[in-house]
């Protein structure tokens, strides 16, 4: 049975991971940042894997909450997609340090479907974008794609990875990075 991580532990876990990286974020360091002891975590059955799963759930919640307004907004698919992609940039910015500190394997465990499942980003992250792509194809403000799920995966990764790189690797402001990735992403999906 998987242990449930007390939500009060997560901010400390994030700090420990951001300070030390996933590989060196021991339970002792996580406990110290969370203001508790390693033994308390141990008694509660909290493992690093349980913490990673709780962080994944937290990120799912963040993305879902950020994309909900674009899903329910009036307007064309293109206008709603722009709103959704801006929201992806905001969430990416809120998690810059965490994403950098996690490393590939833990980050992949959070975001990717198993390779045997088509190699896509997990649907919890991409379904809102896919829905808007379908709506935009229906109202003809966006191109129709043969595989909207795959296109949503491409957009999610294009925005997330490029935005993070421009912010951390090039030192761009959030506004400049958002403007840069959105102009190219939207141009690629807008109908002519």
Residue ranges and their predicted role:
Residues 8, 16-50, 54:
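Helix-turn-helix
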Residues 12-16, 91, 158:
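Short amphipathic alpha-helical elements of helix-turn-helix/winged-helix folds
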Residues 54, 68-95, 148, 152-155:
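Hydrophobic alpha-helical connector segments
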Residues 92-113:
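Amphipathic alpha-helical segments used for helix-helix packing
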Residues 99-104, 137-182:
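Hydrophobic/aromatic-rich alpha-helical bundle segments in the mid-to-C-terminal region
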